[in-house]
Amino acid sequence: MTGNIPIIAITLGDPGGIGPEVTLKALSLLRKGALLKQVRLLLLGPLEVYESWNQKCKLRLAFNPIPFFEPKILTPGILHVLDIEKAFTAFPISTSRRFPLKVIPSTYEIGRISEKNACLAYASLRIGAYLASCGMVQGLVTAPIHKQALRLLDSRFVGHTEYLARVSGTKKVAMMFDGGKLKVTLVSIHVPLRKVPALIKQENIQEKIDLTNRFLKKFYCIKKPRIAVTALNPHGEEFGNEEKREIVPAVRLMQKRKVKVFGPFSGDQIFYEASRGKYDAVIAMYHDQGLGPLKTLAFDRAVNVTLGLPFVRTSPDHGTAFDIAGKNLATSSSMQAAIQLACRFSVKGN
């Protein structure tokens, strides 16, 4: 029976970027492995788009198009493609004047921002978010989108993490990056550096520690995760008081709650120690503080994981790469890792 086998949905991403390319390349490499036989895969996007990228990349993948979402007909090892236009009529998903149903196209423009591409990317994401939020799929892998393009349709769009939290009604989420030897959770995400200090609050730090601790226990099967927390200022506390006022109290409170958390540590040492196995994860105060070290160690293998959602969500840690789109140059290693993690997490959580 397939009823208990988790379903993993993969969004289209911006079809003019490398999203469809890395998705299909990753699936081509993973399809013979045992892991994909433990899940049911569902690609969200027009069949014509996937077929065109299949040809561009000289792959020989076979697709099974399905007009409507029906779990009973989904089989492990098969690449099912859901017709997203028909899905809009089947599901109670609202449309707007900027995004009416009739504008969902089957063609796209390579290597540039366009409203046509944005419509396809947004339609796929909305379907994926709906399926995951309703528990109809257990895992969601999101291919890269161009945020500026999606803002043509949704002025509130900041990024995948914020969008999925909004759609699923989740108040507490965190962005964690898995680089293999190094895992990093961010306290602040997509904000200018000058606005970061205002976000370094005790409650916010405690929330990220708690989400990371719970996730490591549940999905990585680490009984007592060891979590390190970075300082905001150079050398731990020079030129600022955020450490004494916000970070230290957050760490001490979580220690009282029996969480194995340590710090704050200077950012110029802690990532090295964590990558050597001393800690299971690092809580970084801002985007580039955490991602600089992580991408140095795992530039083409890192995976973006959203903590706190009622479903598993992963994504490759790169963008649309318009400059190489359509040239069959993109490497799929990060997308492979994202799909593998989503499969493993969904199997464990199912």
Positions of predicted regions on the chain:
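Contiguous, glycine/small-aliphatic-enriched amphipathic segments in soluble metabolic enzymes
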Residues: 1-160, 203-285, 289-297, 301-304, ...
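A generic local secondary-structure boundary/capping motif
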Residues: 165, 173-176, 218-219, 283
